[in-house]
Amino acid sequence: TRYFSSAASDVYKRQGLQPRAAFGYLTLAVSKIIDVVENSNYVSQLNDVSSYIDKLSENGDESDINKLSIDICESINKKTVIIYSGTDMSRVVSSRWKTQINENAKSKAFIGNLPEVHHNEILSWDADKDGSKKNYIVIFIRDQNEHPQIKKRFELTKDLIGEKVDIIEVNIANQESTLKTLLELVLLGDLVSLNLAAKLAVNPNNIDTIEKLKKLLGG
């Protein structure tokens, strides 16, 4: 499938992949478009990041990032995941985590963004505190580029709801590149979802319910 064509380059996506599994191909496609339109060097940056990501995961199951994903997965277990973010970058990551947990692990996950969470959702933790502790887990996706007020909001959120629900803070900061941080967080989330699928004994590739819905919508 050709996504972009110009005198400079063509980008093709490998056939047969589900969209979530084509993340790398699609990221490359968008980067090539931006490079042509804005005369930038995103593709070169991606090549550098690709080597970095390969190194992170070169030890497979024994890699530090996979071990971290297993720790997070063990904390999640059968709980509903609520993911909070506070910057544009962490919003992208939290959205990816949500959909990967939904699709790969067939588990419930939802997202909220600071400061919006403080205008409404923060109150939802006041009722049924025992049920919240038993059935939910909150994940903070942190970003080294957070505004000081967002940092403060995260700390206050932890203080206000920490006794009502377990909280995991994911704070991966790469001083060299925001892109490296973003893709490392994406990799971590993907591994969390796959390890959670294994723990819950579900097939990450199965999308029967979505296919059934498509058929029903088609009449």
Give short role names for the model-derived ranges.
Residues V36-N135, L216-G219:
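Active-site phosphate/pyrophosphate-binding segments
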